[in-house]
Amino acid sequence: MASNVTNKTDPRSMNSRVFIGNLNTLVVKKSDVEAIFSKYGKIVGCSVHKGFAFVQYVNERNARAAVAGEDGRMIAGQVLDINLAAEPKVNRGKAGVKRSAAEMYGSVPEHPSPSPLLSSSFDLDYDFQRDYYDRMYSYPARVPPPPPIARAVVPSKRQRVSGNTSRRGKSGFNSKSGQRGSSSKSGKLKGDDLQAIKKELTQIKQKVDSLLESLEKIEKEQSKQADLSFSSPVEMKNEKSEEEQSSASVKKDETNVKMESEAGADDSAEEGDLLDDDDNEDRGDDQLELKDDEKEPEEGEDDRDSANGEDDS
């Protein structure tokens, strides 16, 4: 963007021009300034100088919006001081009569513009602008170095004044009385301290006793738990042995029942065999009786036949 646009002194250009003071130009460049202020409107000119810059907008509304939005903003560790070029802040100038920017610009001798189209306008040099703003606005320079640390002055020793013997005697008496008073005070303080120490010791003793009691309780509980844990395996073993014994007895009972059932079955089988034998014997006897009965009528018939034979003869 053209930088000579910011040199125009016509009222319209002055009212739409923004002055950016307290700018850290060592870090902030022209492109940064344009990027920051382009969001408020179209920029037709921008110039960056040592410690300050100018931004030329198309109209005054955009310039005022930029002043309202960016004044007091911190950039590169410095708080910006922004206002319209035609309306400098009153409380910023140095002591003395403050003149408006138009008056300051008007006091400068006019010179023709380099371009024929801008022959009616008047441009100013950057040097003049820098001098003008340096005169009108005071900006803090770099932070001055801290003052050197003053060396500690060692006070000179006082010379002892030698007095007469009477003064020495009085001073000795006073020192003795002071020592006595201090000793009595120290004795009282020692007594108070001793009482306080005794109280603290008694409190500590009580705490220690309570701690010992709690430790004894804990030890007793632990011993009980240990006894329970020791006795529990024995009980488990006893229970297991009882269960084994009961299972063995149950098994024995089952075997006895089986044996008895088997013996009963054998007895019943033997009884059945005996019964079968008896039946067979009875059946044999019956058959023999039947045979005897059959023989008897045959014998009768033989007797009859023999008798009939005898009769015939």
Curated annotation (Swiss-Prot):
Motif Nuclear localization signal: chain residues: 155-161
PROSITE patterns: RRM (PS50102)
Chain positions found as Phosphoserine: 113, 115, 121, 162, 166, 229, 231-232, 241, 246-247, 249, 261, 268, 306, 313
Cross-link (Glycyl lysine isopeptide (Lys-Gly) (interchain with G-Cter in SUMO2)): K8, K50, K89, K94, K176, K224, K237, K240, K251, K252, K258
Coiled coil: 191-226
PTM section of the record: Phosphorylated on Ser-268 and Ser-306 in resting cells.
Molecular function terms, GO-annotated: mRNA binding; N6-methyladenosine-containing RNA reader activity
Start-end of Low complexity biased regions: 175-186
Listed GO CC annotations: actin cytoskeleton; nucleus; pronucleus; protein-containing complex; spliceosomal complex
A Pfam family recorded for this sequence: RRM_1
Composition skew (Basic and acidic residues), residue ranges: 250-261, 285-294
Placement of covalent cross-link Glycyl lysine isopeptide (Lys-Gly) (interchain with G-Cter in SUMO1): K240
Region (Disordered): 139-191, 219-313
Numbered residues of crosslink Glycyl lysine isopeptide (Lys-Gly) (interchain with G-Cter in SUMO): K258
Modified-residue entries (N-acetylalanine), positions: A2
SMART domains in the cross-refs: RRM
Keyword Ribosomal protein among record annotations: no
Subunit and partners: Tetramer composed of 3 copies of isoform C1 and 1 copy of isoform C2. Assembly of 3 tetramers with bound pre-mRNA gives rise to a 19S complex that interacts with HNRNPA2B1 tetramers. Component of the 40S hnRNP particle. Identified in the spliceosome C complex. Interacts with IGF2BP1. Interacts with DHX9; this interaction is direct, enhanced probably by their concomitant binding to RNA and mediates the attachment to actin filaments. Interacts with PPIA/CYPA.
Protein name (database record): Heterogeneous nuclear ribonucleoproteins C1/C2
Native organism: Mus musculus
Gene that encodes it: Hnrnpc
